[in-house]
Amino acid sequence: MLVYENLKNNNVLRHFKQRFAQLDTLLNNPIWVKSPVIELGLNKQHSADIRKTDSLYWAKTAHEQLAVNRHNGLEVTGQVYARPDAYFDSENDDAEKASKYKAKIQAELGWNIINSKFYQGKEKRNKVALANELSRLQGKKRQTADIYEKAADDLTEQYNFYIGTVIAHRLDNLDIMNEAYQFMLEKDRISNDKMLKVMNEKLAAEYDISILCSDRDISNKPIYRMKPSKVLVDTAALWRHIDEESIDARIMMVKEQIADNDSKLTNYLGTTRITPFARWSSYWQSNNKISNNGDVGVRFTIPIYNESPRKRKALETEKEIIKSSRNTDVKEIKQSVNILLKRIENLNQAIATEAYHIDQTSKYIDMRRFAYQNQKQGYNYLMRMDEYTGLLESMERMYKLMLNRGLAIINIEKAVSIYDNNNIFKEIEL
């Protein structure tokens, strides 16, 4: 806060004239800039991490599905054992000795059809793929969670620079007005209220600059003129994205597919064990001869209860729970998005109004400039400075409105899990 002492009228007027000339030059030669773009996307590190994670999940799925494809159900079992009692019983005749054996070797090749790729192989491969896809999507959601905050920070930082430069120019105006009011106060030509009002505005402007541009030098910057714009929203594409393409929707769809696939795998036949087999046995008989024999058959295990219908009903209920949860989530998201869309619409209107006000004020200042120059008896310098300050305030308000609109767009993109640049939002100049 500047406090002036021993002010002279000529010095105050000279400062006004210098500032008016400076403002006229700046306003007639502004630096036109486009509104900052929302850079909502994955940076190189994000993209590399996600590509690596995706490739690992796909490799894991390929290996696990290959394991399913190689599971042909063939099983080899064998046994080797001896019968010690054959050595101790020596009083039996030769026929009895021939019917006994000292040792036995047996090998069996069985085909466990139910627990193989030949029975519901497609569903078994799908189970592997869906489980990995669910884990991949959930991991991707975690990996992309911070891009919205980063996009909001980047957008805010860009706007803060332009807002800060406008405030800095307004602060220069307030410094001169403060100087004039102090001079007038010394001469008892003004009330304290007007001076206090300017001093409070100066304090507020200085505070805003310290918050918005604490790490930037915004002194002696040009006036940046931002072209006003309107944001159009493709609501049909937005609703379609919420229903089908958002990462949350895809996660819920995969969960539903998992429940549906598990329902197909749940059946009575899947709980049985049916194993055709071929067996070869060799006996070392008690008369020291070797005998062989082979046989074929079917070994089966059949539960006397059937819990599959209950499990399928449980899975169908789970599917309904998933659908209900998804519908509830979508409804809540759409309600939040509708509020943000209404906010964007209101901000579009406010920006258009402020842009019109800037245009009209600029024309007014141009007309008044010639009027002031032609007034030989002088004019109200404070009133003229108020006109310039009003224009700067209007520019500041418009930039803040455009920033708030950009943040509303990012909030929508966060709510519906858009994590890359898209064509849902289109910005056009007014």
Give the location of each predicted region.
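Charged, solvent-exposed structural "stalk/scaffold" segments
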Residues: 128-131, 135-210, 349-420
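Outer-membrane pore/translocation modules
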Residues: 113-117, 121-124, 138, 142, ...
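Amphipathic alpha-helical coiled-coil scaffold segments and their short linker/junction regions
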Residues: 6, 28-73, 192, 216-278, ...
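A subset of solvent-exposed loop/turn segments in beta-rich extracellular surface proteins, enriched
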Residues: 8, 12-38, 81-138, 174-180, ...
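Acidic, low-complexity, intrinsically disordered peripheral segments
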Residues: 1-42, 208, 215, 229-240, ...
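Amphipathic alpha-helical coiled-coil segments and their boundaries
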Residues: 9, 39-49, 53, 121-128, ...
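Intrinsically disordered, low-complexity segments enriched in Gly and acidic/Ser/Thr residues
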Residues: 249, 253-263, 269-271, 275-394
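A glycine-/polar-enriched beta->alpha junction
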Residues: 43-49, 55-77, 83-127, 140-144, ...
